[in-house]
Design a protein with these regions (language model features):
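Conserved short loop/helix modules at catalytic or binding sites
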Residues: 29, 58-111
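Non-catalytic interaction/Regulatory regions outside core domains
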Residues: 95, 102-133
Length: 136
């Protein structure tokens, strides 16, 4: 058990020390295609982690979905629009502009699907993420 706690701390440090990809500079070519990973999106003005997710393709998820995608593919933008604490973010375009003006993403590669799910939950807790997927 103690070893798992140490590993959890190292994983948290790994994502916090990973390269930052600022949404205002993000281009698809900056991200590896078809790389499975767990990622965190952070508000650079406050340091608050807004969202933690997992994906089979980091390029598609961050660029095509979170930045450019519609409400159905971009959960974080949906959460921002629906957040009563974000009264200036009234639509998906405003949410996109907020991401570009304020946010960056960091990720750690992970090929194993089960471990990605575990890491998503772990990092959501360890980083005290603001937005969590609704339960079904």
């Amino acid at each position: 058990m103690k070893q798992r706690l140490i590993e959890a701390q190292h994983i948290t440090e790994d994502i916090l020390n990973a390269p930052k990809f600022y949404f205002n500079e993000l281009k698809p070519s900056m991200l590896l295609d078809k790389l499975a990973a767990v990622y965190a999106i952070t508000d650079s003005t406050t340091g608050e982690v807004l969202y933690v997710g997992r994906t089979k393709n980091i390029r598609q998820r961050l660029y095509n979905n979170h930045l450019m995608g519609p409400k159905t593919n971009a959960r974080l933008k949906k959460y921002l629009v629906e957040d009563p604490n974000q009264p200036l973010i009234t639509d998906m375009l405003a949410a996109k502009e907020y991401l570009k003006a304020n946010c960056y993403a960091q990720y750690i590669p992970e090929n194993d699907m089960v471990k990605r799910g575990q890491l998503e939950g772990l990092l959501s807790y360890m980083l005290n993420v603001r937005y969590i997927h609704e339960e079904h």
